[in-house]
Amino acid sequence: MAKVREVYQSFTDSTTKTLIQDEAYRNIRPIMEKHKLANPYAQTVEAANDLEGFGIATNPYSIELHTHAAAKTIENKLLEVLGSILPQEPVTFMFLKPRKLNYMRRNPRIKDIFHNVAIEPRDVARYPKETIIDKLTEITTDTAYIGDTLHFLDPSYIVETFQNCPKLQTLYATLVLPVEAAFKMESTHPNIYSLKYFGDGFQYIPGNHGGGAYHHEFSHLQWLKVGKIKWRDPKDSFLGHLNYTTEQVEMHTVTVQLQESFAANHLYCIRRGDLLTPEVRTFGQPDRYVIPPQIFLPKVHNCKKPILKKTMMQLFLYVRTVKVAKNCDIFAKVRQLIKSSDLDKYSAVELVYLVSYMEFLADLQATTCFSDTLSGGLLTKTLAPVRAWIQEKKMQLFGLEDYAKLVKAVDFHPVDFSFKVETWDFRFHPLQAWKAFRPREVSDVEEMENLFSDGDLLDCFTRMPAYAVNAEEDLAAIRKTPEMDAGQEVKEPAGDRNQYSNPAETFLSKLHRKHSREVKHQAAKKAKRLAEIQESMRAEGEAESNEMSGGMGAIPSNAELPSTSGARQELTLPTTKPVPARWEDASFTDSSVEEEQVKLPGKEAVETATQQVIEGLPWKHWIPQLNAVGFKALEIQRDRSGTMIMPITEMVSGLEKEDFPEGTPKELARELLAMNRSPATIPLDLLRARDYGSDVKNKRIGAITKTQAASWGEYLTGKIESLTERKVAACVIHGAGGSGKSHAIQKALREIGKGSDITVVLPTNELRLDWSKKVPNTEPYMFKTYEKALIGGTGSIVIFDDYSKLPPGYIEALICFYSKIKLVILTGDSRQSVYHETAEDASIRHLGPATEYFSKYCRYYLNATHRNKKDLANMLGVYSERTGVTEISMSAEFLEGIPTLVPSDEKRRLYMGTGRNDTFTYAGCQGLTKPKVQIVLDHNTQVCSANVMYTALSRATDRIHFVNTSANSSAFWEKLDSTPYLKTFLSVVREQALKEYEPAEAEPIREPEPQTHMCVENEESVLEEYKEELLEKFDREIHSESHGHSNCVQTEDTTIQLFSHQQAKDETLLWATIDARLKTSNQETNFREFLSKKDIGDVLFLNYQKAMGLPKERIPFSQEVWEACAHEVQSKYLSKSKCNLINGTVRQSPDFDENKIMVFLKSQWVTKVEKLGLPKIKPGQTIAAFYQQTVMLFGTMARYMRWFRQAFQPKEVFINCETTPEDMSAWALNNWNFSRPSLANDYTAFDQSQDGAMLQFEVLKAKHHCIPEEIIQAYIDIKTNAHIFLGTLSIMRLTGEGPTFDANTECNIAYTHTKFDIPAGTAQVYAGDDSALDCVPEVKHSFHRLEDKLLLKSKPVITQQKKGSWPEFCGWLITPKGVMKDPIKLHVSLKLAEAKGELKKCQDSYEIDLSYAYDHKDSLHDLFDEKQCQAHTLTCRTLIKSGRGTVSLPRLRNFL
C-alpha cells in the first residue's frame, strides 16, 4: 500500500487530483451508506480509530449523539453480522426489541417470534408490551437468538432450552464480556468502555455512561471458555447414567463456537450435536501485556498488575544500563514512561512493588555463571555435562547464583487473551442435572399490565373539550372509545345553546370575508394604474406608435387575447378599518367593521381601458408570449438616447412549426407553445462537430475527456465522421439575462418529476447546482456538465442552458454522437459573452460562436428582464418592470461578502487564492444573479468586448460597486472610456479611519508546578547514534582543484567533528558558497524579470494585506514617524563599539559605489541537529557589506513599515522581533490551538529565491505605505543593479541589507498566505524564514498556477501536537505550557561548548535557555518523549557538574 500511496502522492496536476477525488467520492458514498445503519453517530477521533480497527467506518460529518456511541455501534454491527447469517424463515428472538430487526436487515414479511421476559424492572420499558410473556415457552423454530443476556444465565439454561425444545437446532447469542476482566486489567478499549472492580465482581460501563452499565460476577467469565455442553436424559434416575451407552451420550451434546468478536461484544453459535470446534479460542488483544514472576514472599508483595511488555522491557534495560540504579531514579523512569492521564490506573502499592522488583533486577549480575562448551580440551569437554549437573544440584541445595536468579526473575508471564475451550459435562453430576431441569422463576407481569390498562389511558382523552379547534376529529375519536355509550352526546360549552356555532364554520366565513376585501383592494389599485398608463399612451402620439409597430413581423398564431365572460356592470368595494393580524381575534371585531361604499369602475370598464392601452402598443400581438414569461408589457420604456425599448426583437419569419417528437412530455410542450417556441428542424454543421471531436480525441481541450482511453476518442470521431448529415428538432430560445428563458422549462420539469428521458446539459458546475436546487424532485443525474454528458450519455430530449458558454462544435458533436437524441432545447443570449478557447492548437479556436449558427432558427429575442431594475435595464437597452433605483458606487476598496467580477481568468484565480472564493470573470459570471456585485476595473477592462461588459453589468438586482485598482487617475478615465456603460456609474465612498494599536494584556500569574525528579541517563545516549556513522575528515571535506580541501572538520575529538566549523579564511568553502548561493546576471535582465513578475507581486501583496489586516486604502505618509525611525536606526548604529565603527570606514566613504557590495563568508559553528556528522560538508552563508548610507536609508524604510504593521497586526499573528521568550509564551498560551496538528514551514535557499516577484511585492507594500517615490526607485535600482567582484547579481536577498529581517518576514507571510488557505483565527508565528501555524491548511488551487513562476520552495513539517511532537520555531518548541528550547538541540549545542572547553563562558546563557523547560518540572513528563527527557536530564546534570557553586540568576536558584 505504501507504493500505491506514493504513486498517488506524486500526482501534482489539480485536474487529476480532482478526478481521483471524484472517483473516490463515488466509491465512498455507498460504503458510508452501508455503515450508516450500524454507525450513524458522531464519534470521538479516538473511538472512530478503534472502530475502524474493527472494520466499522465513521462518518466524520455525522452529528447524531449517543451517550455511549462506540459501544452501541459495536452492538449494532454484531446484529448486522447476525442478520447476514440467519435464514430467511421465521426465527425466535429472545430478549430483543422488535425494532432492532432493522439492524439485521430482516424482511418484515417474515413472521418472526418474540419471547421477552421482564426479569429486571427496566425490562418493562425496554420491550414492547405485546412481546412480554410470563415465562419462556417452547421454541417452535429451527433457529433462535438470545440478545445480550446469556452471560447472566446459568450454563444449565442451555441444557433446559435444548431439552425442552426438540425442534431447536441452532441458537445464536450475543454476550458482553470484557476478556481483560479475567486478569483484573483496565479496559483495553478505554474509548469504548471502562471497567470497575468491586469485590467478587466488576462493572462494564459503556462510554463511561453509568446508565448503560452491566454488573458481572467473575463466574460469568466462564462463558468465554465453553466449547461443548453435555447432559443425560432426565427421564433416567439419578444413577441411571451408569447404564448409558456411547450413542446415548452423543445424542445430548451441543457445540459452542465463537462466530464474531468486537472488543467486549461476542457472537456465539450454539449448535445441537457433537461437532468440531477449535481447541483454543482467541480474542482480540490490541497490546501485549506481561506479569512479573512471583518471586517474593509473602506473595502479597509481588507485582500482580499486568503491564505493557514494552514498558517492562524499557524499565529492565534502563536499570541494567545505568551505572547505579537508585530507587529515586527508577521511580523517575516509571514516571517518565507512564502518561499523566494513565497515572490514575495504577495504585501506589503496585508502583512500589514494581520499583522494588526492578531494583532487585538491577543488583543481580548478568554475567553467566555456567561453563561454555568451547573452552578446554577433550577431557574437559567430556566432563562438562557432569560438572553442569553437579553445579545445578548444588544451586538447588545451596541457592541460585546471581545469573540464574536474573534469568528466572525476568521470565515474564505473558497475559494472553487465548483460552483452551472446556466441555461442561452434566452427565455424571446428578445434582447439577437436577439444577438444570428445575423450573426457573420468572417475574410476573400481570400486575404491571393492570397498571397500564387501555381504559386508564383512554380516559385521559375523554376529558378533552368538545369545542377544540379540531372539534370534528376529537368527537370522532371520543365516540370510538369503549367507555362511552353509543347514545351519549357530547357536551357543548356552557351558555345559550342557540348561540353555539361550529368553530370551523366561523373560521371559514371569516376567511372568506377577508379574501373578498383583498380582492376588491387589488381591483382598485389595478384600475388606478390603468388610468395612468392610458394617460401616458395618449402623450406618446399616434405617429411614433404606427412607425414602430410596422417592424414587428408576422403575428403569431396564438396571438388572440383571451375573452372575458359577462360580469356585473359595476363593482361596489367596501372601505374598512384595519383588519387584525390574527384571525382568531378577528371573530370578535368582525361585526364592528364599518363599510363605506365607494364607486369604482366596473369590470367591463376596466377591461375596455386595458384593451385601449394594448391597442396602442407596438408589440400588442406579442402580449400573450410576454405574459407567458411573466411580463405585463403595458408600458413604453426608453433608453438613455430616448429610443423606445422593444421587449421583442430579432424576429425570424418563415420558420415552419414542426410537431413535437413522439414521447415529448405534454407539460414541456405546453410551456414551449405558450412562449411561441415551437420546434424547427435544424440541419447540423458536421464540420463543427468534427473539429470538436478531433480536439477531444487528440486531448487538446477538456479536463475529464483527457482522462478517457484513446479508443474512446477514436470511437467518438469515427462515429461523427461516418455521418453524411444529421438533422434534429430544436427549440432555440434567446433572451436577455433574467428574462425567464429557463423558468418555464424548470416549471415543466418540476411537474414531470422523475422517470423522464430528459437531460439538461450545463456549461458550469455552479449552474448545474442551481438547476438541481430549483428542480429538486428529479433524478440527480438529469443535470450534467457538458463533459460528463459527452462521456456518460444523455436522454432522448436534451436541454442546453446558456449554450453560448459551451465550446464551439460541442452541441453538434453531442447530437451526432448520440443518435437517440430527437429534440434539443437551446437557451442562451446572443448579446452576452461566448465560450473562449485558450489552447492555441485547438481547431475549435477558429470556429464562430454557436449563437451565430443557431440564431437563424430562433423565432424572436426576448429583450426583457426580471433581474435588473428599470433604471439599470433601460441604460443597457433592456425592458424591465422592476421599480426602484439601482445603487451605484465606486472606490479603490473592496466590499466584503459580495461577488467580485474581474476582467481576466488569471485575475480570478489569483483573487480566489486570497480568499475571495466568489470571484468570477466578466464573461464567466453568465447565469449569476445576485443582489449586489462589485466590478474590478484594471488595464484589461479596456480590451473587453461590449458583450462581455453587458454580461458583467447585468448581474446585480440592487447594487453595483466599481473597484478601481489603479492609483493613476488618467488610467482610470481611460478605463471608463473603454465601454459605453461605465461613465454613468460614478460615486464617492468615504475612506476608513486608521485603527489604533492596542497593547497586549499582562501575563497572568500561574501557580508553580509540582517538583519532579528525572532519572539518570548515560552521558553519550544522545550523540552516540551520530558518532557511529561518522566518516573520515577528508571524506567529508569539500575539495577544490585550485584551493585543495576545506577545513571544516577539526580536532580528533569525535564530538567536535560532528559539527562543521565554517571560517571566513577558508578559500575552498568560500568559492563553494559563492557557487551555491550567488547568481550573476545583468541589469537589463533583472529589470525585465522585475516587470514580468508584476501580476505575481500583486497577488502576494493582496494576500499579505489580508493576512496583516492592513487597510484597503493607502496609509498616508507620516514625516514624524519617519524621522523617529531614522533616529532609531542611527542610534542603533552608533551604539556599536568604536572598533566596529572604524572597521566600517571604507563603507562610510562617499567614494564607495552605492551599488557595490563586498561579500564575505560567515564564520560559524553549524549546530543544527539535522546537519550533525553529514557525509559531505555543506556550503556556508555569505554576508554582504553595502554602502552604509544605503543600509541606513532602507533600514529606516523597513522600521517605518514595521511601525505601521504592528499597529494593524491581528492578535493571532506573532512576529518574533524585539520580543522576549516570555512575550512569545504569553501569546502562545492565549492564541495557540493544541487540539489539532500544526505546520512549521521551512524553505530551500530562502534568500536566493527572492526574485522579481518578491521585489514587486516589496514595491507594492512600500507604495501602500506611501513611501516617497524616489526612495522606492532607489530600492529598485539597488536590487536590480547590485555589483560584486564577479559582476551584477541576480535579484535576491542578501544578508546585510538594511531591511533584511523585516523583508524576509513579510515575504514569508505573503508566500505562506498565497500558498495556503489559512482559516480565520489561525495562530501564526513568523521570524525571517521561520514560521509555524497551529493548523495544517490546504494548499490553494490558485497556487498551482503560480508555483512554477516562483523560485521560492517551501518544506512543510507537520507535527501532531502531542507528547514528543510539538511545533518548532527558531529552536523553540511551542507547547501547552509555553515555549521552551528544544532539549535535544540545546543539549547538542552544550556538548559542543563543553568539548571546546568554553562552557564556563556561556553557562549563563545555557542556564537561561534551560530554565524555560525546567520551570515546568513535573509537567515535562507530559511534554517530552523519552529521547527528549534524556537530553533534558543530561543538560541539567552537565550544568550542575560544571563546578559553579552558586548562580547569580534569581530564577535559577531553585534549579541548582
Curated annotation (Swiss-Prot):
In what residue span(s) does the (+)RNA virus helicase C-terminal domain sit? 863-997
What does the similarity note say? Belongs to the potexvirus/carlavirus RNA replication protein family.
**Species assigned in the record:** Potato virus X
Q: Name one GO biological process term.
A: RNA processing
What EC number is given for this enzyme?
2.7.7.48, 3.6.4.13
Keyword Phosphoprotein listed: no
Task: Summarize the protein's role.
Answer: RNA replication. The central part of this protein possibly functions as an ATP-binding helicase.
Output the Gene Ontology terms for molecular function. Answer: ATP binding; ATP hydrolysis activity; mRNA methyltransferase activity; RNA binding; RNA helicase activity; RNA-directed RNA polymerase activity
Q: What is this protein called?
A: RNA replication protein
Region (Disordered): which ranges? 537-573
Q: Where is the composition biased (Polar residues)?
A: 560-573
Please write the reaction equations for the catalytic activity of this protein.
Answer: RNA(n) + a ribonucleoside 5'-triphosphate = RNA(n+1) + diphosphate; ATP + H2O = ADP + phosphate + H(+)
Q: Which domain of life is it from?
A: Viruses
